[in-house]
Structures are given as C-alpha cells and as structure tokens.
Curated annotation (Swiss-Prot):
This is Ferrochelatase. It is an enzyme of class 4 (lyase). Pathway: Porphyrin-containing compound metabolism; protoheme biosynthesis; protoheme from protoporphyrin-IX: step 1/1. InterPro entries: Ferrochelatase, Ferrochelatase_AS, Ferrochelatase_C, Ferrochelatase_N. The gene is hemH. It comes from the Bacteria. It comes from Chlamydia felis (strain Fe/C-56).
Length: 318
C-alpha cells in the first residue's frame, strides 16, 4: 500500500486580507499562547489582540511585497517532493483556516493508506509541531498517521545547512576566516521550557553539530520574535546584534529553524536586525532560508525516508 505524506507548515498571509485571519488563528491557538485562561475568554482576548496587531504588521507585509512566500514555497516543495518520493504529498497550512477543509478532504480520499506527517520545523516544540499534531488528530481521529517530530540533527539537514551557508559565502566572496554567523531561531517562553518542552535542547544540539563542522567560523546561537510579557529564551537576536564584539568584518544572520522565508526573516531580520549591525560598522547580510538551497528538496526526501516515526502521544502536551 502506498504511503501518503502530509507536509505541514505554519502558513502565512497570501495577501492583505489574510492578515487578520492568520493572526487570529495563530494567537487563539492555546498551544501557542498558553492555557492560563478559560477557552472562551482566551479566544475573545486574543481575537481582539490579533485585530489590533493588523495595523502594526500590515506595513511590514507591504514592505516585503504584501504577502508571505511561505504558502507558495510549501506548495512548490510538495510538488517537488512528490517526484522524489514517488508518492502523493498533501500540504497543511496550520494558520490558514480556509485551506483546512481541502487538506482534510484530500486525506480522507486516501482511505486507510498510511500517512507520514512531516512538519517543516527542524526542532520540536509542543507549541508548533505539537499543535499541528493535535489539530490533525482532532479532525481525523481515525487517520493512520505517524510523524517525523524533528530533524534538526539529521546528517542530511546538517549537510544541507552547511552547504547552503558555504555557497552563500562563496557567492559573496566572503572568507570563512572573516565572518561571524548568528544562527537565529524563533524564541519560546521560558514557562514552556520549564514545563519540559525540549525545543531549546534541540536547537542547542543542532547548533553545536553545525558549529563543530564549521571550525574556522565564529558562531553564536540566538532567539528572535519575542511576543508578549514574561521571560523568553536568551540571548535575543536583537541583543546579540547590539552587543556583539568580534574582529570579523562580516556578520551573517542565518535563519535557524525557519525552513522558508517569511516575515520573521524578510522583515524582522532584514529590516530590523541587519541595520543594527550595519550601524555598528559590520558588513551584515541575511542568509536566505534553506528553502532557497537547490539541495533542500532532495535532502528533505532523504530525511523523510530515514527518520524514525513518532506517535501522537509523545507529541501533544495535555
């Protein structure tokens, strides 16, 4: 029996009218923003916050072309993966609710075929990968599905990341001896880490492996995109950009954990962090997300075919 693959990603606004719907879907997800309020109050509060945030983020999306490329990138990647895997690849965009019905219908159409879920996040967190798993099992409880929970330390991911970075350096005529790399991952509240979320450990292990294979390059791990009050993982990317002391001419920010470019890379890194470094007289550049690597689709196919599967029980936080 043929396997079916479910390629799951964050989703992102395809146009301006998607922004409020996207933010509402994201912020009302209790796996993301927490379970400290009763569900009905949580939904009302974060729906209000999402509506208020539109005015802030709309100019940011306008600055990067009016949309997020993550939707199109995921669809294109699914088409390419289908050729490598010689099997159907269905997409799931977690925070684009008007796409969910089609995903569910397409999965149902394959009946009892085994499904392999592939969230496009190298490092596991209950807040993102766990949310995807929870959603699919809630809407398709009888689906015969297992999951690739993370792949940030898979040899093929490590190879592809290093190859992508070195080719970027070569294309910009930058010596490995004269650059510093800031690996910027999405942040996470410390209250989640303190409750056992393994995200930071996965990030640190992946970063350590890559750094060991780049022995002649100065590297730092940092975290971006803090939202709301409370302590988050540190150091923050902004703080590192403001306080970094290196004798290297070039400082490159590498999206780490972001497999596709979207507002966190195209705006937050490019328009907020890169200027900080340039103001401090570093030659600063943003490395594109790994999706831009010509090796990525083939590498991901290898990762999918060689990674042990996980069941939902280990991926969902009660």
């Amino acid at each position: 029996m043929v396997s079916v693959y479910l390629l799951a990603n964050f989703g992102g606004p395809r146009h301006a009218s998607d922004i409020e719907v996207f933010l509402t879907s994201l912020l009302t997800d209790r796996d993301v923003t927490g379970k400290f309020l009763p569900p009905f109050i949580h939904k009302r509060l974060f729906s209000f916050i999402a509506k208020k945030r539109v005015a802030k983020v709309l100019p940011q999306y306008n600055c990067i072309g009016g949309f997020s490329p993550i939707y199109r990138d995921t669809e294109d990647l699914a088409d390419t993966l289908s050729l490598y895997l010689d099997a159907p690849v269905i997409t799931f965009h977690r925070y684009l609710p008007d796409t969910h019905q089609l995903t569910v219908q397409r999965l149902k159409a394959f009946g009892d075929c085994p499904v392999i879920g592939v969230p496009l996040f190298p490092h596991f967190t209950y807040s993102v990968t766990g949310s995807i798993v929870r959603f699919i099992h809630a809407h398709l409880p009888l689906l015969n599905i297992s999951w690739i929970s993370h792949f940030g330390n898979h040899p093929q991911f490590i190879f592809c990341m290093i190859d992508h970075i070195l080719k970027f350096l070569q294309s910009h005529d930058i010596s490995i001896h004269d650059c510093c790399l800031l690996f910027s991952a999405h942040g996470l509240p410390m209250r989640y880490i303190n409750k056992g979320d393994p995200y930071n450990k996965h990030c640190e292990k992946s970063f350590k492996t890559i750094s060991e294979r780049l022995p002649n390059i100065e590297t730092h791990l940092c975290y971006q995109s803090k939202f709301g009050p409370g302590r988050w993982l540190t150091p923050s990317t902004k703080d590192v950009c403001e306080t970094l002391k290196t004798d290297k001419t070039y400082v490159l920010i590498v999206p780490f954990g972001f497999t596709s470019d979207h507002i966190e890379t195209l705006y937050e890194i490019e328009k907020e962090y890169i200027p900080i470094l340039k103001a401090r007289e570093y030659r600063a550049l943003r490395v594109p997300a790994i999706y831009q690597s010509p090796e990525w689709a083939a590498s991901l196919a290898t990762i999918i075919q060689s990674t042990p599967r996980a069941e939902k029980e280990s991926l969902i936080k009660p």
